[in-house]
């Protein structure tokens, strides 16, 4: 994909005269509306000022790429749309020939990024939509990478926590549409390697999810979740939980199934899906499968009665 951008598609300078039709000023410089065919085969049609592209214009590269938007002294600057040779495109703000400000990038696989850009890279707050799965990352970006507090939203659940180099790290939680949250943390561990990989110096680090607690739904705020802590005193309520000492019957049933660490990647659609087996919760059970990674409740009827009480 063309996310690296138009730095690979340099526009011909106006010193290379080529063919030109249009207005000129008293000094003979290109000025006003004009059309140019440059020696390298590129073309430009639009506004000029004192011999430079300035104002609205359309620059077409001979390889099929084109830019439609604003120029300031030969530089893409302001609002503009760049269509790359592979069909991907960027619509948004430019500064000094770079994607800078707010914009939308449409990738050839139908993924989209909508948000802030800095010096040609995704940087700041932005949303990346994965077209194939419908999942989306909503949160912070640093130098083109998913990094900082964010929310990864899937079809029937979401992960809320912190990311580093596109991987979830530290404390966070999974929020399921059936009405519960699973708290825990991601720990970066070395991936197990086979014999054929023993001599390789590079070590792949993968995040592993360790679940610690199940609670009722709580309001999400875009701040790093704190690691849940237990209390020894009875009768002390923890946020979003029935009690902070011992979990309720539903939470206990869920926790019994996943003692220890699990390989769970928020970006993998089949790794951490909570399936709703039936809308009639009092007749069906939700079970946690160690192989498939499905986190389910033992008796939804019990949870519903607890909520009513």
Curated annotation (Swiss-Prot):
MORN repeat start-end pairs: 20-43, 44-66, 67-89, 90-112, 113-135, 159-181
Compositionally biased intervals (Acidic residues): 1-19
GO biological process: axoneme assembly; meiotic cell cycle; spermatid development
Keyword Repeat tagged: yes
PANTHER family: RADIAL SPOKE HEAD 1 HOMOLOG
Disorder noted: Ciliary dyskinesia, primary, 24: A disorder characterized by abnormalities of motile cilia. Respiratory infections leading to chronic inflammation and bronchiectasis are recurrent, due to defects in the respiratory cilia. Situs inversus is not observed in CILD24 patients.
Protein name: Radial spoke head 1 homolog
Organism for this UniProt entry: Homo sapiens
Name of the gene this protein is made from: RSPH1
